[in-house]
Amino acid sequence: MVKIGVIGLQGDVSEHIEATKRALERLGIEGSVIWVKRPEQLNQIDGVIIPGGESTTISRLMQRTGLFDPLKKMIEDGLPAMGTCAGLIMLAKEVIGATPEQKFLEVLDVKVNRNAYGRQVDSFEAPVKLAFDDKPFIGVFIRAPRIVELLSDKVKPLAWLEDRVVGVEQGNVIGLEFHPELTDDTRIHEYFLKKIV
């Protein structure tokens, strides 16, 4: 039985839990999804999702709760991880616009610009092209970060908005600018689950 953890410190945690449950069901995989708040819960999981929210807050709370160091090591050791929006920022190697107290997991060789699309009012939805499926995916961008550079050839584009990369994959790690959990389309969560089973 597969167990997926969603880092539940701040952000759209319940939406990711529901989307992952639906994806498990659609794939016919027996599994469960847990809300991770403490480091000892990390030992129970086969994959982790870092949701959107506010990256400064998520970074601070991950350090305060003791999740940061063990999670970083587990991802470096091969734990499948997916980060959306602020979760992408947390996974990134380099972050433009970071505050001095922010710490990042640095497990994804990308440079991201923290609030590249501007304020909440500039949020938008647009069709995104996926590397693994011909049908477009509706990308929900909410004060999204922007992937400005791929820092190694280990990083593979996974999603495009027109000709710009908005989602990437590097081994066991997926990072997305947008929020797949805010749609009824579970294809990205299913793709992530297939990395685990």
UniProtKB/Swiss-Prot annotation:
Pfam families: SNO (PF01174). InterPro entries: Class_I_gatase-like, PdxT/SNO, PdxT/SNO_CS. L-glutamine binds at G53, E54, S55, R114, I142, R143. The keyword Glycosyltransferase does not apply. The active site is at C85, H179, E181. One of its GO terms (cellular component) is cytosol. The keyword Isomerase does not apply. It catalyses: aldehydo-D-ribose 5-phosphate + D-glyceraldehyde 3-phosphate + L-glutamine = pyridoxal 5'-phosphate + L-glutamate + phosphate + 3 H2O + H(+); L-glutamine + H2O = L-glutamate + NH4(+). SUPFAM superfamilies: Class I glutamine amidotransferase-like (SSF52317). GO terms for biological process: glutamine catabolic process; pyridoxal phosphate biosynthetic process; pyridoxine metabolic process. Its EC number is 4.3.3.6, 3.5.1.2. Pathway: Cofactor biosynthesis; pyridoxal 5'-phosphate biosynthesis. Disulfide bonds: none annotated. One of its GO terms (molecular function) is glutaminase activity. Keywords: Glutamine amidotransferase, Hydrolase, Lyase, Pyridoxal phosphate. Catalyzes the hydrolysis of glutamine to glutamate and ammonia as part of the biosynthesis of pyridoxal 5'-phosphate. The resulting ammonia molecule is channeled to the active site of PdxS. In the presence of PdxS, forms a dodecamer of heterodimers. Only shows activity in the heterodimer. Belongs to the glutaminase PdxT/SNO family. This is Pyridoxal 5'-phosphate synthase subunit PdxT. It comes from Pyrococcus furiosus (strain ATCC 43587 / DSM 3638 / JCM 8422 / Vc1).
